[in-house]
Amino acid sequence: MASITRQAYAEMFGPTVGDRLRLADTALVIEIEKDHTIYGEEVKFGGGKVIRDGMGQSQRMAADCADTVITNAVIIDHWGIVKADIAIKNGLIAGIGKAGNPDMQPGVTIVIGPGTEIIAGEGMIVTAGGIDTHIHFICPQQIDEALTSGVTTMIGGGTGPATGTFATTVTPGPWHMERMLQAVDGYPMNIGLLGKGNASQAAPLREQIAAGAIGLKLHEDWGSTPAAIDCCLGVADETDTQVAIHTDTLNEGGFVEATVAAFKGRTIHTYHTEGAGGGHAPDIIKVCGEANVLPSSTNPTRPYTVNTLDEHLDMLMVCHHLDASIAEDIAFAESRIRRETIAAEDVLHDLGAFSMISSDSQAMGRVGEVVLRTWQTAHKMKVQRGSLPGDNARHDNFRVKRYVAKYTINPARTHGIAHVVGSVEVGKLADLVLWRPAFFGVKPSLILKGGSIASAAMGDPNASIPTPQPVHYRPMFAGQGSGVAAASLTFVSQAAQQAGVADRYGLRKRTVAVENCRSVSKRDMVHNDWQPDISVDPETYQVVADGQLLTCEPATELPMAQRYFLF
């Protein structure tokens, strides 16, 4: 039998079972768990290669073939780290397996035909498009920035650079909801908007859900009182929508116990649950142990570094309209920034108690760094805490699955969109991101929206080949013309979908209703479902979880940083 060295095989067809990859310049290493391709029957495109007429390409009609095949890719997702060919059909993931010509090859599960396009995935990593659930829609340019970082779904609120939007992720009222849904209709990004949840009467909240909001946002700047919390969650239960909350930093309406009591066991997504981004000082972090609380972080505290505290004070003054000349405003800012709880947040992520990571875009967060800071946190914890149970000296597969879930499947489940996005699984929208391993988490090579390429690192358009400098991100065809509407989704409430808001507003994108928002709980947070009993010392701010002190040192140096951004 003919043989080939492992190195030569990896160079030709990409890594296979037992091969390992380093992620960017981190300390994280993955090992391929399974290879769905067949040795000796791999497909590859190019001169003298396999995918040619009568060889790896069949004669079958387009209806029986994939529209696009990504060949020999390494998939990283919450369910596994595998090598496979990926089929895309009608904008959806149609297969994960072995591609080729079933008339010539054994074991083919994905048919390549004359109507099939090929994307070479050899040596590449494929992940699901990221989901950022904490967006202040302050400027539309955020969408391009997020897309080129590997994010394909944005959830939040706002109306542009209005004072309310600078501070809160809220698109308030039916009129603003209609205008914003119309505005985002032209962008290659899946988008869902949150209405204002701060009201003590239900009617103003119901009308926002009916207008298209996929959920409601409670924010302390609008008054996150127990009465508002109770009312908002009641409307959410009626309409099967999610509630996100930024709790009461100053403890004016009650302490954290009063807020938890107002939840009444109902599901809620707690933003920046550590507290630097806002929330009951100093112990909002305790809520991550509640079964009905779905806790997330925003990325400025990810991970804890020697610069974290200083930059937060300046950010806070701007984002929450505070005045440095007013002593009470300074005290408010300083009460939110605590090194002890930020350090504990790192550890709680590594142990799976914090379930999600998001941005807080332009409002104490960086919209293009959700993916990057997730992996920086994973690296820091690997270096400081060693391997997790389930991992070993060869690989960090479990830790990688835990962290990728924080910006893919878990936010999708939280906001009722996991039936269409959030993972690399058959039947879901083909929102896929391709990475060279050396640039993983930092700079993707291709971003697919609904099976079409929406953005890519592209060279000089006037060059004779695609690679000459300057190479930078450029919009591709899925972000142009009518292709935008075909490749992306607008998420709305079930009530809005039934009322036909898409036609009423003149939307071109397909609208999809959120579902199962009220039945989701902490136990549904994949690899991130730990519910510790947490206490915070009111004087030292030390965090103890199930009797264990949680702390770590700030990082003085991180991977995925300067060496990737010289130009």
UniProtKB/Swiss-Prot annotation:
Keyword field: Cytoplasm, Hydrolase, Metal-binding, Nickel
- Give the UniProt record's GO annotations in the biological process aspect: urea catabolic process
Cofactor(s) of this protein: Ni cation
Where does the sequence pass through the membrane? none
Tell me which residues bind substrate. H219
Entry's Gene Ontology molecular function annotations:
nickel cation binding; urease activity
- Pfam families on file: Amidohydro_1, Urease_alpha
Keyword hit for Aminoacyl-tRNA synthetase: no
Q: Locate the residues binding Ni(2+) 1.
A: H134, H136, K217, D360
Subcellular localization(s) per the UniProt record = Cytoplasm
Q: What is this protein called?
A: Urease subunit alpha
Q: In which pathway does it act?
A: Nitrogen metabolism; urea degradation; CO(2) and NH(3) from urea (urease route): step 1/1
Origin, by domain of life? Bacteria
Which source organism?
A: Delftia acidovorans (strain DSM 14801 / SPH-1)
Q: Which residues carry this modification: N6-carboxylysine?
A: K217
Subunit structure and binding partners:
Heterotrimer of UreA (gamma), UreB (beta) and UreC (alpha) subunits. Three heterotrimers associate to form the active enzyme.
HAMAP family noted in UniProt = Urease_alpha (MF_01953)
Q: Where this protein primarily resides, as one coarse class?
A: cytoplasm
